[in-house]
Each structure stands twice: as structure tokens, then as C-alpha cells.
Swiss-Prot record:
GO biological process, any: enzyme-directed rRNA pseudouridine synthesis
Isomerase is among the record's keywords: yes
Keyword set, alphabetical order: Isomerase, RNA-binding
Family of the protein in this entry: Belongs to the pseudouridine synthase RsuA family.
UniProt-recorded name of the protein: Uncharacterized RNA pseudouridine synthase aq_554
Alphabetical list of CDD domains matching this protein: S4
Domain S4 RNA-binding residues, every copy: 1-64
Length: 238
């Protein structure tokens, strides 16, 4: 693993901050100062920062069922609390954030982590990671309106809609590969419908547990994490 990445994972700082420590000569590998951020830390080598031995901590990966009324950002406002209020006491020293946003009046799956690279890849348009939603509308939607969803453009760019399947008269399962602000609501608004209920049920291969209640969370299994990384070709050893 590169030295700057090793420090980033050990100290939970940015790669930029890690490079600054290295450049200033505050980092030793096996007793010798190393000033190359790209230096590969080998198995068995000890890394020290200002005389203190450091080792990468295991990242946190959580599935959270975000309830309505909670922000998917780490900043709170006067009206709504952050999702962090639901998990903070269990991870007091971790800088956790959500991989992607979910409207404050929506509920469903939030992937919570401190793995910045994975979060970045899962939300980057390049990787086309699918997000699945259950959408209930203010009235029944017709087949022609459903077809028109595939033609909708926002800011002159087509919405990346993979599939829109009618589950009942007023309920649609929508799968998108993008996360623009209020994209689901704006998509349906473009064909004359208001969204009255929105729930995210899947991100990539990760599906919200059926027995999970709003506000509940669990850690992802090793296999679930591996599958997410495989989906976006993320090899943390690089």
C-alpha cells in the first residue's frame, strides 16, 4: 500500500494531509524518514508519525434504514437532525458519512462508511451504480406517461433511468444510475406527477433488509463489502 494511503487509513485524514506529513519529514518507515508519498509499505514494516507507531484501522461499513425527517448529510440544520444522531454513540471517534444522498422526506437505504474512496466511486457517474426506489404518486400513472419517463431531461441532460416498472396504479419501482438533487421527484414531475412517498431499497448489489425498521442499522458482512468494491473495481491494496 502507498505510504500516503497507509497514513490516510491509519489517521483518518485526507491523502493531501498525509502527503503534507510525509513532505515535512514527520514520517518514518522502519526507523528511516521517508519523503516519498508513493513509497510502498511492505508487510512487517513499522510506520511512525512523530515517533508514534500507526496502523490502518478497519473501515466501517453500515446499512442504515434512514427514517423520514433525517438529513443524509453530516451537517444538521435548525429543522432536521443528521443521520449521525442514529449511530453517533456507537462510533464516537469515526468520521462517518453517507455514500450518496437521500431526500429528508424520503426513507430507506443509506450506506454509511468512512471509506472515502469507495463512497466516491459508488456515487460517481462513471460507474453507473444502480439505485432502486419505490415511488408512490399522487394519482395513478398511465402506460404512456411511464414511457415518457425515459425521455425526460433535466438541465438539458437525459435522466439516467434504467427501468420504470408499475407495481400498482400509483406505485412505480424506478432504477436510476445517477443521484442529482431531487432527481426522482423531478423525473416524475416532468410527466405531471407529484411524489408522495419515496423509499430507496437498493444501492448496487446491496438491498435493504426486509425486516429492518426505520432508524435501525447493521454492519455489512465481508462478502457484501467485497461485492460493492468489485462493482466499482476498487482494490484498496493499490
Amino acid at each position: 500500500m502507498r505510504l500516503d494511503k497507509y497514513l490516510s487509513k491509519s489517521l483518518h485524514i485526507s491523502r493531501k494531509e498525509a502527503k503534507e506529513l510525509i513532505r515535512e519529514g514527520r514520517v518514518k518507515v522502519s526507523g528511516k524518514v521517508v519523503k516519498q508519498a508513493e513509497y510502498r509499505v511492505k508487510e512487517g514494516e513499522e510506520v511512525e508519525v512523530e515517533g508514534k507507531s500507526v496502523k490502518p484501522k478497519k473501515n466501517v461499513y453500515l446499512m442504515l434504514y434512514k427514517p423520514k425527517g433525517y438529513l443524509s448529510t453530516t451537517e444538521e440544520d435548525k429543522k432536521y437532525p443528521s443521520f449521525l444522531e442514529l449511530i453517533r454513540e456507537h462510533f464516537p471517534s469515526r468520521k462517518l458519512f453517507s455514500a450518496g444522498r437521500l431526500d429528508v422526506d424520503a426513507e430507506g437505504l443509506l450506506l454509511i462508511t468512512d471509506d472515502g474512496e469507495l463512497a466516491h466511486r459508488l456515487t460517481h457517474p462513471k460507474w453507473k451504480v444502480e439505485k432502486e426506489y419505490i415511488v408512490r404518486l399522487d394519482r395513478d400513472i398511465g402506460d404512456e406517461e411511464l414511457k415518457k419517463l425515459y425521455e425526460v431531461k433535466l438541465e438539458e441532460k437525459p435522466v439516467q433511468l434504467v427501468k420504470a416498472e408499475k407495481l400498482s396504479g400509483d406505485t412505480v419501482k424506478a432504477i436510476l444510475t445517477e443521484g442529482r438533487h431531487h432527481v426522482v421527484k423531478r423525473l416524475f414531475k416532468a410527466v405531471g406527477h407529484n411524489v408522495v412517498y419515496l423509499k430507496r431499497t437498493r444501492v448496487g448489489n446491496l438491498r435493504l433488509d426486509e425486516n429492518m425498521e426505520p432508524g435501525e442499522w447493521r454492519e455489512l458482512t465481508e462478502e457484501e463489502v467485497k461485492e460493492l468494491k468489485r462493482l466499482v473495481k476498487y482494490n484498496p491494496q493499490n
